[in-house]
Amino acid sequence: MSSNVVETIQPVAAAIVSAHQFELVDLEFVREGQSWYLRLYIDKPGGINIEECAMVSDELSEKLDAMEPDPIPQAYFLEVSSPGAERPLKKEADFQNAIGKYVHVGLYQKLDGKKIFEGDLTAVTPTTLTIDYLDKTRHKTVTINREQISQARLAVKF
């Protein structure tokens, strides 16, 4: 059900977001406990502010309320926010823009004995990512096939 909701709402949300020259980073419809959440993550160069999130929320809420049939028949919470410092990497442009940045990549199965790699993204191809990471005190490089990646995001280095 949640994928149908996302497929139905995505073009509506994308039109509103792009009309303001923002980027729709991600859209999800998820159940947490007893409640459903429709979450949009939006951004722009220099970052998004709370007023811009509220504006998109108001416009999307109005559009969704006017849609027939109702794309979300059950009660839900609409949340519009910035993707934050640990922005997810999903689209090709996200990966390209992350070259040279510190990333967190989770895998479906272990590679070289690890399921999680954190390091500097050094190269991106249509099928692979290359990360320079620190293994204890040694610098290592790993090339990961994209189909092995369960999730990828920017990370904050401490």
Curated annotation (Swiss-Prot):
Listed GO biological process terms: ribosomal small subunit assembly; translation
Protein location: Cytoplasm
A Pfam family this chain is assigned to: RimP_N
Domain of life: Bacteria
InterPro entries recorded: Ribosome_maturation_RimP, RimP_C, RimP_C_sf, RimP_N, RimP_N_sf
Cellular compartments per GO CC: cytosol
Assigned keywords, A-Z: Cytoplasm, Ribosome biogenesis
Family recorded in the similarity comment: Belongs to the RimP family.
Role according to the record: Required for maturation of 30S ribosomal subunits.
Name of the featured protein: Ribosome maturation factor RimP
Native source organism of the sequence: Lactiplantibacillus plantarum (strain ATCC BAA-793 / NCIMB 8826 / WCFS1)
